[in-house]
Amino acid sequence: GPTPVWNASSLKGTQYPVPGAASEPKSVQAWDDFVTAVVGRYAGQITAYQIWNEASLKMFWQGSPEQMADLTERAYRIIKDKDPSALVVGASTTVRLLGAFERFFPAYVEELAARDWPVDALAVHSYPSGAQGPLDRARNLRLVRHTLDRLDAPDLPVWDTELNYGLAGPGDVPRGEIVGDQATSWVARTHLDSMRFGVGRTYFYIWTPEPYE
């Protein structure tokens, strides 16, 4: 993702970053062609492909979990054919908005199971709210693990492909600033919690303070 305007099934709803960007593709063949072109160009250079960004949020994905699982399976087949050593990581889901998480993630996992697990890893974004810290992130990871256990999912790797602290929201929660010794201790705590909850990879977004340029 995102979906280009010309291949969007709908231009309604979110306009980020362009109209139709969160829409399911009108032509899945165009999706196949896109994946084929990317993997053909970067085979041997890109070692892992995440299928979609934050598909649990309507601003990034307005299709269904079933449709996202279909895109995942199609991409998996192409990637494994063109570059068998590359890893396929499922569409990421945020956790801090519980309603969005519950609406997307369990159904997506069930749809992946129905397709015989066309992923090498699952992806979450474990941001807590702007006023919360590592303990709250750990609760988010515990929820992910509980959900996977409840659905009797296999022992697939879980990657935290985007997280940080102080991100504004949800709602009117302002952004926070974590610096100095607090930042140092939170980074250490974060990686220890990742180990504790079996999170194989942890990616901070991003390390620099605002402005990002």
Regions found by a protein language model. Name each.
Residues 1-119, 123-129:
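Substrate-binding cleft and catalytic face of glycoside hydrolase catalytic domains
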Residues 55, 162-163:
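Active-site metal-binding loops of divalent metal-dependent hydrolases
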Residues 60-65, 132-136, 178-179:
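Short, solvent-exposed loop/turn segments at secondary-structure boundaries
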Residues 88-89, 159, 203:
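Structural detector of well-ordered beta-strand residues that form the stable sheet scaffold
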Residues 164-213:
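Aromatic/acidic polysaccharide-binding cleft in carbohydrate-active enzymes
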